[in-house]
Amino acid sequence: MMIAAAGTRPQRAEGRGHLAAKLLDGRTRLRELYQEGAAKIRLPDTFDASMEAVIINTAGGLTGGDRMDWSVEAGAGTRIDVTTQACEKIYKASAGTAEVRTSIKVGTQARVDWLPQETILFDRSALFRRLDVDLDESAEFLAVEAILLGRKAMGETVMTGLFRDRWRIRRSGRLIHAEELRLSEGVAALAARQAVLGGQVAFATLLYAGPLAEAYLGKVRPLVEGAMGGASAWDGKLVVRLAAADGFSLRKILIRVISALRNGAPVPKVWNL
C-alpha cells in the first residue's frame, strides 16, 4: 500500500532585531540590543559622538514567506546611522510574499539616518516593505530607499513580480509624510512608461525631515541636475526622487546627495563605490 507524503511547508527565514540608544557623557551609547533568528546587528567603532549600526540578514536574501522585523529607538540627544551590510536581494517567490517591517522612534533633539544599501528585485519576486517612523517635535530624520530592477550588468530583467513599499512618518503623532508604491505583474512594461521610470531600472527616494529642509534644498538641487529626478522642500521636509540606467550610476548620485544632507559627513563605509 502506498501512503501519500504529507505536504510540508518550506523553511522560511525569519528575524527580529531591536536597537535602542541613550546619551551618556555626551556620546551615543547602547541601551538595548536584541537579535533573533536571521537578524543580526553590528556596531562598528566610531570616532565621534554618534553610533553606527549595521543590520544583517544572515539568510543572504529573501523570498516568499520570509519575514524580517527591525526596530530602532534613539533617545534624547542621540545620533544613530543605520545601514545594511550589503544590498538586500529579493529572489523569485514560489509562494507567498516576503515582508520587511521597520519601526523607528527618534527622541528629543535626536537624529536617525536610515541608510540601507539598495534592494535588488529579481524576476517574479514578491516583497511588502513597511517603514513607520515616530519623531519628536525637535527630532531629525533622514531616509533613503533605493531599488534595482535586476542587475543590468548580469543581463537580468524583471518582467513580473510584486513590490509594495509603504512609509508613514509622524511628528508628535501627526502624519507628515506618506509613501504608497506598488509595482505588480507587468513590471518591465510599467517601468518603460515615460511617466513612470522612462525605461530606467534603478530608482530611489530620499526624505529629510527637520528644521534644515529648506536650507538643504539649495545644496541638493545642483547635485541632481542632469539626472532623471528632482528635489522639493516644504513644511519642514525635503524629498528627492531619482532614477538612473543602472545601480552604479544611481549610487554615485546618492552618495553626493546623502553627504549633502549630512552636512558633508561621508556615507557609512559599506556604501563606498
From Swiss-Prot:
Transmembrane domains' residue ranges: none
* Protein's cellular compartments: Cytoplasm
> Any keyword Chaperone?
yes
Quote the InterPro entries the UniProt record gives: UreD
GO CC annotation: cytoplasm
Coiled-coil-forming residues are none
This chain belongs to the protein called Urease accessory protein UreD
